[in-house]
Curated annotation (Swiss-Prot):
Residues 1-19, 108-119, 276-286, 294-303, 466-478 have a biased composition (Polar residues). The lineage of its organism: Eukaryota, Fungi, Dikarya, Ascomycota, Taphrinomycotina. One of its GO terms (molecular function) is RNA polymerase II cis-regulatory region sequence-specific DNA binding. It comes from Schizosaccharomyces pombe (strain 972 / ATCC 24843) (Fission yeast). Belongs to the creA/MIG C2H2-type zinc-finger protein family. Transmembrane segments: none annotated. The gene is scr1. This is DNA-binding protein scr1. Residues 80-102, 391-413, 479-492, 517-526, 537-555 have a biased composition (Low complexity). Keywords: DNA-binding, Metal-binding, Nucleus, Repeat, Repressor, Transcription, Transcription regulation, Zinc, Zinc-finger. Residues 1-25, 79-119, 261-303, 390-434, 466-565 are annotated as: Disordered.
Amino acid sequence: MSEATTATTTGKPSRSTKNPDAPRPYKCPLCTKAFYRLEHQTRHIRTHTGEKPHVCTFPGCAKRFSRSDELTRHARIHTNANSRRNAAAAAAANNSARSSNSPAGNLEPSTNNAGVHMTNASMNPNVNPSYPVFIPQVGMSVAPPVATAAVSMSYPHHYSASVQQQQATFVSNGQPHNLPAQAQPATIYGIPDALHTTQNGTTIHVTGTPPGAVSQRSEPDSRLSSMNEMQLLASAAANQLDAAPRITPTKSSGVNLMPLSNAPSPPKQMNVVGSLPSSSNTSPNHLASVPNRGLTSNSSTGSFTKYTNGSSNSLYSNSSMQTPYLPSKSNSSTSLHSMYGVGTTAYAPQSLRYAHYNYLPYSRPSVSNGFDDDSSSSDFAHFRYQRRSRPVSPCSTAPSSPTFSTRSFSPTPDVTPLVTPAHSPRLRPMDDPSCVQLPSIRSLSLRPSQVPLIPPLKCDPNAFSASTPASGAVSRTPSSVSLSSLSNVNSSMPHKPASQSNVGPVRISSNRRSRKFSSSSRVSVSNLLAGSPPSPSSSTKSASSSYSTTTPAFSIGPLTPMTKP
């Protein structure tokens, strides 16, 4: 339908009347119309060619549309649960699936063909039969389809669902056996739970009536398998599971977890979820499936299968096999209880029951003797967030930090510590007596320690008598004296006789041995003016010459022989 026709029928003006001057680079090759966008041109060309690429994906509906919005509007009819057309389309899809030659239609009951009939689920309007249950023939490799549940988990053997007693038919080597409704694996939300095929290619026909009487089903019989009954079955299974007391599995009734999709199956055992051993003397057993309450209703990854081990001739056990996936306890001591770090998940908390399978890289396997310990349900949370360095390795290879020795409930793994680990040097205070204190960098030098070239000049009060005129001019406190103050003091001293000038040096030389510590700190004024390095002899001369002479040249003339030791 062109845009002009659309504008006429809807009563709204087309884009050509809104902005006629806008450029229209996309022109129709079959007519004279031009469009603003390429999508509009493509949609218009389909009106000429009659192409309808948008196909309705609902089973039984063969309508096609040229526009995606028309398909979206049409799909709302099928999603309406109260629509009678929905039920009629589902019935038509069921009839067409039986008569067609598709893999889903080749599931008629026979002794040589391996197939599963889900007539109860196919009669439900809300069930989507677009997930075909394809069972290969004898000798073909069996692999579960994408739509099947990738994770299956066992329930305690004392579980029994309160459902109506219906008859199911189990065909083994062409011989039918009547089974109660507990052995009927129900399909919930339109997704097949598993492939039900044995090793020798036998077929499990899960129907409300025998396989030959499928076409003779009445309308009330088909309504018994509606979505309401499936939801009641799921709720009854969940309530029974929550109210179930804790048991300890024994060797006679081992309830083990089914292996995950990547776990290898033991040799000569089943490879498909829900498969049955080829035994002619099988007896009824409980088998049901409930959806994962932790996921959405249409999820295909949360379906669980319930199976138990009854007597020696039960449906899932015989004299040589305990479970269809695990060898007997005499052959292997490894139990999948401990391999995935949890026991029966019926005893796990409500919020963590199915979270173990959603966080698969955080589980750490541990091999034990196959018996559950009496640990609390909080152990499930310990193993849930215990991350492995490599998800495919059997055990962790990364060393955990000593700081995080206890397991944590936080999602942060313990291989990346947030604090200083134990192998780093500990920081201690500076005044810690246990630490070895090294000298600072500023106190270290490559040159040997030297006396400063110009040490401060200090005067000893014992070196001079009280009658010395210059004793009051020099400060008696040990403080440094500048060169200018020394020159002023020496120039202002009065003239003294020569006999009196010898008193000072004699007194200094007599007391020099008792005061060696003070003589090394005295510096001659003449040496300071001349710039020569200090010496003990010159320091003694400075004390005598500075107070015995009056000339500013500070000569030491006759005092030189008296200063030798």
